[in-house]
From Swiss-Prot:
The cytochrome bc1 complex contains 11 subunits: 3 respiratory subunits (MT-CYB, CYC1 and UQCRFS1), 2 core proteins (UQCRC1 and UQCRC2) and 6 low-molecular weight proteins (UQCRH/QCR6, UQCRB/QCR7, UQCRQ/QCR8, UQCR10/QCR9, UQCR11/QCR10 and a cleavage product of UQCRFS1). This cytochrome bc1 complex then forms a dimer. Heme 1 (or BL or b562) is low-potential and absorbs at about 562 nm, and heme 2 (or BH or b566) is high-potential and absorbs at about 566 nm. Component of the ubiquinol-cytochrome c reductase complex (complex III or cytochrome b-c1 complex) that is part of the mitochondrial respiratory chain. The b-c1 complex mediates electron transfer from ubiquinol to cytochrome c. Contributes to the generation of a proton gradient across the mitochondrial membrane that is then used for ATP synthesis. Binds 2 heme b groups non-covalently. Disulfide bonds: none annotated. This is Cytochrome b. Its main location: mitochondrion.
């Protein structure tokens, strides 16, 4: 009798994706983040579903409905804390996943990489509209500041902003539609994840060495299922520690005050995972220029495959490129720090220098380093 998992139409897909999938034998823990992102997405969809059962998307009751969830709903406080901190874990895994892709040259699988960038943008959009829902001070003013950037677009900007708002400012209509967006987008993300995996399984995973691993592959199960299970347990340990011991450490204290359109918070800033992009936005003293730089800071990922000049795929044996990669990492951390600081000296100039170096590292220095390493590897005799 033939095995059901190899013959049944549905089981066959699962079998080829998670059981009999040939995987390179040398992929390190950096390849765990894909599965961890899948776990994060499932946690967010489940906790979000239970929150949506008790939340009301009305300006008069949104804030108190979140308080009601935390006070009166069975384990509502836990569901809310898991959802809020789950978003932070999601972005932490996303940034590490993208960083791994850049370091080991995974971006050369262009279709997988491009779908990944679209996924990143969709997750960022979902997190942004989700942050507006509790209708606290930072929710309201964050929504006002970021949606108002649309008005920088020539000719159609103001009309576009008012169309998104559903009125002349961020109000009841905005909150209702943001809740609708926040509910539907995770399912769009789930569909994109399937497409992402489809393209990935067409080529197979890359590996740390960057050379063709076809001669040495092992089945995904049990080797990588057990490895992913360990990663999953560590992720849950960190998430539960955050949610149970210091659930508000990554949030903004201003969001414990209900939204008040008549009082602006002293420092408007988004959640920590958007601070690097927010710092780039603020570093340009022109509205349209800032918006374009903000978009470019993420969309630049799309051109990375075309900037690859090295003969070797991975940075594993390329010390100059490695150095530049870690400088880029430090640069992004600097931008994250600057994004949370007030707009005054010396933070303004540090932010501007960090923004310029962010783009220069990716567009100029890293491609040049690849070419230089090719030259250094050529025999000189």
């Amino acid at each position: 009798m033939t095995n059901l998992r190899k013959t049944h139409p549905l089981m066959k897909i699962i079998n080829h994706s998670f059981i009999d999938l040939p995987a390179p034998s040398n992929i390190s823990a950096w390849w765990n983040f894909g599965s961890l992102l899948g776990v994060c997405l499932m946690i967010q969809i489940l906790t979000g579903l239970f929150l949506a059962m008790h939340y009301t998307s009305d300006t008069l009751t949104a804030f108190s409905s979140v308080a009601h969830i935390c006070r009166d709903v069975n384990y509502g406080w836990l569901i809310r804390n898991l959802h809020a901190n789950g978003a932070s874990m999601f972005f932490m895994c996303l940034f590490l996943h993208v960083g791994r892709g850049i370091y080991y040259g995974s971006y050369l699988y262009k279709e997988t990489w491009n779908i990944g960038v679209i996924l990143l943008l969709t997750v960022m959009a979902t997190a942004f509209v989700g942050y507006v829902l509790p209708w606290g001070q930072m929710s309201f003013w964050g929504a006002t500041v970021i949606t108002n950037l649309l008005s920088a677009i020539p000719y159609i900007g103001t009309t576009l902003a008012e169309w998104i708002w559903g009125g002349f400012s961020v109000d009841k209509a905005t909150l209702t539609r943001f809740f609708a967006f926040h509910f539907i987008l995770p399912f769009i993300i789930a569909a994109l994840v399937i497409v992402h995996l489809l393209f990935l399984h067409g080529t197979g995973s890359s590996n740390p060495s960057g050379i063709n691993p076809d001669s040495d592959k092992i089945p995904f199960h049990p080797y990588f299922t057990i490895k992913d299970a360990l990663g999953c347990m560590l992720l849950l340990l960190v998430l539960l520690s955050l949610a149970l011991f210091s659930p508000d450490s990554l949030g903004d204290p201003d969001n414990f005050s209900p939204a008040n359109p008549l009082s602006t918070p002293p420092h408007i800033k988004p959640e920590w995972y958007f601070l690097f992009a927010y710092a780039i936005l603020r570093s340009i003293p022109n509205k349209l220029g800032g918006v374009l730089a903000l978009l470019a800071s993420i969309l630049i990922l799309l051109i990375i495959p075309f900037l690859h000049t090295a003969n070797q795929r991975s940075m594993m044996f390329r010390p100059i490129s490695q150095t530049l990669f870690w400088i880029l990492t430090a640069n992004l951390m600097t931008l994250t720090w600057i994004g949370g600081q007030p707009v005054e000296q010396p933070f303004i100039i540090i932010g501007q220098l960090a923004s310029i170096s962010y783009f220069m590292l990716i567009v100029i220095f890293m491609p040049f380093a690849g070419s230089f390493e090719n030259y250094m590897l050529k025999p000189k005799w």
